[in-house]
Amino acid sequence: QLTRSELKKNWQYFHRATNYAFPNVAHVSSLLRNNPTLEASIPNKQSLNQVVNTLQDAWIAFFTGNFQQATQLGYSLGPIGHGVAFYSQTTYASRLEPNTDKRHALWEDVLNRHEQSKDFTRYDSMTRFFAFFSMARLSEEISAPVVLARNYVGKMQQALVELNTDDPQNVFVLAAQGSMDAGIVRKLGKLMGQLTYGASAQTVDEYYQKVTLLDKNIPNVQLEYAQSLLYMHGKKQLKQAINHMRHASEVQPAFAMEALDVLHAKKLLVELMEIDKKNGYGLRAYVKRNTDMEKKYYF
C-alpha cells in the first residue's frame, strides 16, 4: 500500500509525462482561492484538509491499480477531482474492460461529465486531456459516419491545439498530436484523411521526435508510436514499429497503469514479431482490430 508520504516522494516520477502539480494544502488552497466557482462546486462543504486528503487518496488508489475507488473518490469532490477520476476511468476502459458497450459507456460518461463541468476545469490539463483521450478512444471504435456527424475530429484537433499552447512540454499531448493524424488515416484512409483533415506522416514524425527528445521513457508513448507508424505506413515501417514496441515492453513499470501498458506492449510485440515472420501477413487485421473497418477487405 502506497502511503501519502510515498506518494509525495514519487510524485514527480509518476507524473513525469505531465509535471502535474502535487495536491498539497498550498496548491489546493491557491487553486480554490483563484477559482471561487470551483470551490463552490465541491459537494457537502468539505474542508480544505478533507479535499486534499481525498485527492491524495484518489491518486494512491490510481497508482496502486484500484481504478474504481480512484474514480469514485475523484467524483466525490466534484470537478476538482475530475483529473484523477477521468484518468482512472479511461485507463480502466482502455486496458481492462472487455465488453465493447460498457467500454463505450465509460468513455461517453467522461465526455458527458466534462461537457457539464468544463468551465470549472479550464486550469486542469489532466482533466482536459483525458476528456480528449476518451473521445479519441471512442472514435477508434465507432463508425466513421458517427465520428464525422459528431465532429469528433474537429473537436479533438482543437483540444490538442489548446492543450499544447497551455502545456507545451506535456508528453501525453505531444504524443497525442502525433497519434491523431495516424488515427485519422486509420479511420478514413490516407487520401480522405489528408484532404479532409490535413493528416500527414510528417506530423506523426514531428511530434514523436519532440517526445523522443524529452526522453521520459514512458511505455504507453512508445507503444502508441509503434501503433502510429503502422496506421500511417503499414508494412513499410513494421520493423521500426517493432523496435518501439520492444522499448515499451522493456520499461520497468513504476505503478499499476504502467504495468498494464508494459503487459499490453509485450502482447502486441509477440503479435508483430509473428506478423514480421510472415512477411506482413496479418498486419491488416492487426491495424483494423476493434474498428468498424475490421471486416472490410481493403487496407
Task: Please provide the spans of the model-predicted regions.
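Alpha-solenoid repeat scaffolds
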Residues: 80, 84, 96, 184-188, ...
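Eukaryote-skewed repeat-based solenoidal scaffolds used as protein-protein interaction platforms
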Residues: 118-129, 134-192, 201, 206-214
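Alpha-helix N-cap and loop-to-helix initiation/capping positions
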Residues: 101-105, 147-151, 195-203, 236, ...
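N-terminal alpha-helical interaction modules that lie
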Residues: 1-140, 153-167, 242, 247-299
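A cross-domain feature marking catalytic cores of carbohydrate-active enzymes
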Residues: 90, 175, 223
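Long, repeat-rich segments with strong aromatic
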Residues: 203-260, 271-277
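Short coil/turn linking the two alpha-helices of tandem helical-hairpin repeats
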Residues: 91-100, 136-147, 183-194, 226, ...
